[in-house]
Amino acid sequence: MKQTHRPPRSIYPAQNRHMRRRTRVLAGLVAVLCFGGLLARLFTLQILDPSGYANRAAAQQLRDTTLPAARGEIYSADGVTLATSKTCWTIRASPRELADELVQPAAKALSEILDIDYDATLQKLSKRTSNDCLLRRRVDADLADAVRAWCTQNNAQGIQILQDTKRVYPQGNFMGCLLGFTDVDNQGLWGLELQYDAQLTGRNGTILTAKNAWGYDMPTHYSTLQDAVPGNDITLTIRADIQHYLESALSAAVAEHHVAARAVGIVMEVDTGAILAMSTKPDYDPNDPRTIVDETIRQQVNALSGEERSKALQTAQQAQWRNKAISDLYEPGSVFKLITCAAALDTGAVTRNSRFVCAGKINVAGTNFRCANGHIHGSETLAQGLAVSCNPCFIQVGARLGKQNFCDYFAAFGLRAATGIDLPGEIKRSEYYTADRMGPVELASCSFGQSSKVSYLQMITAVCAVVNGGKLMQPHVVQSIRDTERNTVQQVEPTVKAQVIRPETSAVMRELMEGVVTTGTGKNGAVAGYRVGGKTGTSQKLDSENERARIASFVAVAPIENPKIAVLICLDEPHSWTTSGGALSGPVAAEVLQKGLPRLGIQPSYTEAEQAKYFTTVPDVTGWKAPAAAQKLSEYTLTADVLGQGERVVSQYPRAGTTVRRGSAIQLDTTGQLDPAADEG
């Protein structure tokens, strides 16, 4: 019989059955647990926390983007935009989102478009675990568009183009020390930008929107969470036209007279304390504040290296940014005689006709003081002594006034404390003698403007009090602040800080100051058509290592019969044919007055002598040959502007008999095409 083979039976049949049963039970339990977990998760998502699930889903599709708020604008009193905000873009990258094969091409393209270093860009993009890195800030629209185009063309994810704003100063190198500047985050760092940072800074907004990787909005719904609110706008008391006249004249003086330690100019409204112009030259362009403007200093800094160069650059930048008009002290020199004179008149210690003797020098308690340039004026009145700026005269005036009265009026004119102007960086102290420390020698020296140091702003503020009826005004540069709806947030009104001298004293001082310009040392400050009062100053810098260092200054007030504006010009260490304030600074002040007064609606009124000196009547040269007509005009101190190639003059403009300023150009038409009536209209 044939045998068949069967598989052997397990020798442990009961044990195998038990294991199979356990496996089935465990598998069932796992299935139940998984299904239960899934049910619990669905219950949580659908019933207990539906919004949390939606938020997490949206977070993968939506981007929370800051909408930068524009910084407030700054305007001049005559409506010129001085500081504004411009839209720009920031380019950032998320290297972990950028495809490996695009790292090097992206580094090459972005470094070329954005003008940034290739190696540094490649290093940033190669950090594959990085979520964010900055490539370049403050990119203009054309560069941002170029980056977008490259990203679109190469389907590059991880490059972000974010909207931002940057501060722009449309007038360039204009009012730098006054306006100041901001940092890359648009926070004020200097000048008005710092002083009014809280007002100028807006409130950023936020937008939740679907975006692709390089910053494009995707075609889907988005919701704005909060609109950006721009900062408040500020209107200054500064007039751009007056500021331009001041800066132009001051820069020319710095160049012509080789001023070594910068020059200062301030124009103040006499009755209100409003600053119409303020300048320190040389200064800087607030669009590029870290570039040294002074070529000599820039070359000196660039000649250094390493840490030495860094320190020198920082020192030069700080000096360039410094608003010398409010931050530095100086010896006012003979301009200060106005204060001594006003105090002595107000107390009755002297009158305008009090007489003094100048022998060229005077001895006080064993110390000799000489008159400027060794002049011997002999017997002179107070008016004459002020006109010729006689030192011995004012030493005697100071002695009659007395040290206590001198110190009291020094304080009353605001010369011991900061003015409190709405600008940062004003020096908080001045240098002066108190009555208990002042002997006869110190009183003598202080009486004519030496041995005390004040700020330039303090000095012109005090001079305004001398001529405006005796009121010490609060100087200020901001006129008003408005929000984006043009609602007035703040309106600055003139503030009288003190009544320093009697109005009668002020009236006498105006007459004496006019004499300085008409008959004395201030003749270079005269302006045709206006009555001008002033005072010259040439002060020694007592703390300078250079014994010949001087400050040439001049203060002018016009119209002196009804004062509207005061102008202070100071050239610190001029290297010219003279250091006289009347000779160097007087013409600068006169130029500012001549150009500025008409802009303020104050028209000239000429005397007969001025009319003859500055004006002439246009002769009739029609029918004349052109060369002969030009020669005839030159006899009247006029120039010819010949139009066309004709032989004879057919018509002229202005017409014959018109009164014009000498030096004017007269149009001579040889073609017959000139229509004078059109020009007159």
Predicted regions and their residues:
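Beta-lactam-recognizing serine transpeptidase/beta-lactamase-like catalytic domain environment
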Residues: 4-6, 83, 212-225, 271-335, ...
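Conserved "repeat-terminator" motif of extracellular CCP/Sushi domains
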Residues: 660-680
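Conserved SxxK-family serine transpeptidase/carboxypeptidase catalytic domain
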Residues: 133-151, 160-177, 233, 415-419, ...
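A non-catalytic structural micro-motif
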Residues: 638-642
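Short secondary-structure junction motifs
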Residues: 156, 260-263, 351-353, 418, ...
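Periplasmic/cell-envelope proteins involved in peptidoglycan metabolism and beta-lactam response
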Residues: 1-304, 329, 404-414, 525-527, ...
